[in-house]
Amino acid sequence: MNRDTSPDLHYLSGFGNEFASEALPGALPVGQNSPQKAPYGLYAELLSGTAFTMARSELRRTWLYRIRPSALHPRFERLARQPLGGPLGGINPNRLRWSPQPIPAEPTDFIEGWLPMAANAGAEKPAGVSIYIYRANRSMERVFFNADGELLLVPEQGRLRIATELGVMEVEPLEIAVIPRGMKFRVELLDGQARGYIAENHGAPLRLPDLGPIGSNGLANPRDFLTPVAHYEEAEGPVQLVQKFLGEHWACELQHSPLDVVAWHGSNVPYKYDLRRFNTIGTVSFDHPDPSIFTVLTSPTSVHGMANMDFVIFPPRWMVAENTFRPPWFHRNLMNEFMGLINGAYDAKAEGFLPGGASLHGVMSAHGPDAETCEKAIAADLAPHKIDNTMAFMFETSQVLRPSLQALECPQLQADYDSCWATLPSTFNPNRR
């Protein structure tokens, strides 16, 4: 199938907006959504990301004006190769850490290279999250959509060109991309190979966190989120359309590109965000604030203040707290923490936590800075200090994350992770305060 040449990429700015875009002038109907005859002979189609009757502030839906309706497809057949078919592992309360996963030697496109790491709900549930590491060394020729949830992509190696139904966006390490549930897309590799992390959100769509006493500005600012403008492919010829449904890959063959949306308007859109634009908040007096101040996006639950999933980053920042143990404190958490590292080093781990690696601390798993970090922090001169050239992140969820069997059996699982705390000394002296 012949594709259009790469367009000059343009974006719409904002988060949660009611956007509108057209690749041909006048392709958007005026004053209504579904006219008897749409402009240019297009078909009108609605893509719903939430229930019809959600509050307007939470509603996600987009009207698409396309060359052929999505209903024009044959029967889906289950693919023989099921890369995500492995079960969750047995109950395991231990702290876990993985070295970086290698890029496969055999040709592997974006959807073939997902390694399941952990999950806390089946895809049929209206809540929860599944976490993967993706690895790829060839661009996709087929098109994919995920019926199981919204996808948050966190590249660690390699730039991605993501062609979606609504337009094209390019994402590099230190940027993220979010693709709504059910939206068709294709991932092309701009650097030959790629690796990164995926959070598959089965719950409420991601949104910006409330700022509370921080005020009307700070953290991730809405204007820095970018949604691609309309771009369509008018191509004849066979293309495989793959869907992920309840964790399995099913496919059919089309005789046209399904990325044929000429115009669209709505709020259920793909977007990208540059993590370097995050307005980091921290103390200017004493103590280390809770890591919730680093939240970029959140998927809420019905319990106010408890997240189905938070996406949290630990970016470059100044440390100026006086009379304070500056690394993240020792902690036992109600929430479950899956961490990854995009570049640099994480300030709570001197060794062993590498870019492309991961860690999992389940509910009430005791964790904190390793022995080397702790020793240095207690003895440090508390002059202002900048943590630079780093970007760690966390997928945090209120439901227990169970590691996959593949993650527990892979050679990258570090058997000696607990040893990073083993040399923490007892410095208690009841005779000296």
UniProtKB/Swiss-Prot annotation:
Q: Does the keyword Iron apply?
A: yes
What is the protein name given in its UniProt record? Homogentisate 1,2-dioxygenase
How temperature affects activity?
Optimum temperature is 37 degrees Celsius.
Active-site feature positions: H288 (proton acceptor)
Keywords for the protein's UniProt record, in alphabetical order:
Dioxygenase, Iron, Metal-binding, Oxidoreductase, Phenylalanine catabolism, Tyrosine catabolism
Judged by the first EC level, this protein's enzyme class is oxidoreductase
Tell me where the transmembrane regions lie.
none
Top-level taxon in the UniProt lineage = Bacteria
Q: What's the catalysed reaction?
A: homogentisate + O2 = 4-maleylacetoacetate + H(+)
One of its GO biological process terms is: negative regulation of DNA-templated transcription
- Positions contributing to Fe cation binding: H331, E337, H367
Q: What is its EC number?
A: 1.13.11.5
Per its UniProt record, the required cofactor names are: Fe cation
User: What does the annotation say about its assembly with partners?
Assistant: Hexamer; dimer of trimers.
The family this protein is said to belong to: Belongs to the homogentisate dioxygenase family.
Q: In which pathway does it act?
A: Amino-acid degradation; L-phenylalanine degradation; acetoacetate and fumarate from L-phenylalanine: step 4/6
Q: What does this protein do?
A: Involved in the catabolism of homogentisate (2,5-dihydroxyphenylacetate or 2,5-OH-PhAc), a central intermediate in the degradation of phenylalanine and tyrosine. Catalyzes the oxidative ring cleavage of the ar omatic ring of 2,5-dihydroxyphenylacetate to yield maleylacetoacetate.
Molecular function, one GO term: DNA-binding transcription repressor activity
